[in-house]
Amino acid sequence: VDYEWQPGYNTPAKLETDVFISYTDEHIYFGVKAYTDPNDIRGQVRPRDEMAMGLNEDIVFLRFDPYLDARSVYLLASNAYGSQSDIRAKQATSDEERYDSSFNAIYETISSINEDGYTVEFLIPFTSIPHPNAEDKIWGFNVTRYFTLEGNGVFTMSDKYDRDNPCRICQIEGRLIMNDVPFKRNTELLPYISSNLSGERASEGQPIEYGKSKNEFGIGIKYDINSASTAELTINPDFSQIEADETQIDINSAYALQYPELRPYFSRGMDLLNFLDGAFYSRTINSPSISSKITLQDKNSSSIILSAVDQKSPYLIGGEDKSYFGEGGISYINTYRHQRVVNQNTKYGFFTTNRFYEGGGSGNLFGIDGLFTFNKIWKIQFEFIKNFNVEPVANWIDSDDTFSNKTVELDGEKFNGHANYLRLIRKTENWESIIFYRDISANYRADLGFVPKNNRRWLTISQGYEKLLGNKYLQGYRINVKGDITNNINGDKKSRNLDIDLGITTIGATAINYNYDINFFRNYLGKDFRNVGKSTFLIISNPTKELSLLTRIVFGREIAFNEDDPEIGKESSVFFSMNYKVGNNLNINPSLRFSKLKKINKPGVFYDGYIARLSSRYQFNNDLSLRIISEYDDFNDKFYVQPLLEWNPNPSTIFYIGGNQNSSNIFNVDPEEFNPFLINRSQFFIKFQYLIGV
């Protein structure tokens, strides 16, 4: 690992790293020797994929490009304590679209820290990395190491890196050549059993009364069609999350909020269903009784077929100024996506999603998309989508609002719409220029997606400049200016917006960013607002190997979106999160979200509250942990605590036992008399799921 590519630019690596490679018919073996002062090593034993905030740990990434075309690059990583992380990357226009952390691969790591640094050993089954179906294999491969030196983060790599080529994963120059490796079909069974017991107080002052336990069992089956393609079937799957979502402040949001997908089933091959539009959002498959998935790959294409029967069907209606949400009953789901990969610079495809509701109603969506790269620095990306909908006749949504002379209320209306996206990007080492056009009709609806906003024609023009300096106290800086022009489909003016971003990276692995966002004009619910501007400061810092900090401060003018008569208020919001490592095993993560919108021309506030959260984890080893999460929501006077003991030796095998203890004002007690720390609802749960290779 000879080259430093950040902050240096293909300069000699400041620390030595040696890599040793071997393979058998079933596994690839890597040994990595990372030289450093052991007192400078950062990190601790942690759960899989929970990388420290701001990458505050010493870590080694192995990158594999089995098809040599950047369609799917697999990053398998380990920190100095043997704790794993795995990521799937693809050719894309931004880091947010490029990296998919939901990918899970089964591999083993062991590590040791010694007087001249640390070593990590990887044992990776061939079956964990989809690859061309041939006995003689040639894969793209390189190694990246990250460490902190003199207070600043440093990346070194086994390949040189051209900063004028924004496709980092297209620049994997190393080759793994492995001959006479036969394909060995892998079949996996994944049975589970689970039980949960819930109860609540029948009346104030009474003890919690528990009902009967709910016991579930199910099984998943995965069959390797070949070394790149699989078929999966899951019957009565348990798609529940064992860790509560971190509550977002939505008191002044006119649209539904999106939460990340945390369920392991939605990993293999699911990167094919990531779209600019949000046409597919896996959390809309809420409670399936059965689901199947087939992923197919060959030299020039990739495909996925996903089907499910959902017992509880979320229903989201996007709108011009706000969205509407309800929950329906049983629905039948199909999704198909095919992508043609010509080379690392050209890929295009088509897709369809279909949802049919029991009792009537359906949503069908069809689209084509593509990404083309020219002369390394130019990219053109497009998505053109058409939807055809028949509303169910149901009471899932209660609203008298209308769109395109149709009612939001679900009354069996038929309609169709479209969503078109076109993006042009030019990116070099220092400059980035973006033109992005979106055209979303008022009748557009994605029944398997997350599209809370429609009825808009939206043009974004952005120009940015970034410079890496490599100085101790100023690692780099960036400047970006972005303008937005938005009209509705009828041509009525909706917004005229300007964003200015300034950022620096400095000592202590600290990134400081300032954003000024001003709406020169904004129309909301037929009311015009002018010169509504606010500032945001964001600071992410790793000043020591034990401490990581994140602070976001927002102040300025904002619209009170959820008032019957919206008006301008004075906003002040703060988010603070700290991650502190105690020794090699204990991690403490408190956070606080505060938000207030004060009335300007009269006394009082539109809202004022906070959400406080504390997450503490003791990691006995890389597989076993005890975690306690507690959160108090001042906006809704709710408190919960969630203890969880978890054993997770690989992405699929898991045993956990835990509970949720909640308070909520279910007896309509006066807010002054309500005790938010008195538990009114209680749940205990246990689950065992074990991966069996056949």
Which residues make up each language-model segment?
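Short beta-turn/strand-loop junction motif enriched in small, turn-promoting residues
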Residues: 127-129, 355-356, 466-468, 631
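Primarily recognizes Gram-negative and organellar outer-membrane beta-barrels
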Residues: 182, 188-213, 263, 316-332, ...
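Exposed, low-structure sequence patches enriched in small/polar residues
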Residues: 287-289, 302, 363, 371-374, ...
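Glycine-rich phosphate/diphosphate-binding loops that line cofactor/substrate pockets in enzymes
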Residues: 184, 296-299, 339-346, 470-475, ...
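Hydrophobic core segments of beta-strands in well-ordered, beta-rich domains
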Residues: 304-306, 348-353, 381
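Structural preference for beta-rich elements and adjacent junctions enriched in aromatics
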Residues: 1-339, 360
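Generic short beta-strand segments
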Residues: 2-3, 33-37, 193-198, 308, ...
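Active-site-proximal loop/helix segments of hydrolase catalytic cores
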Residues: 367
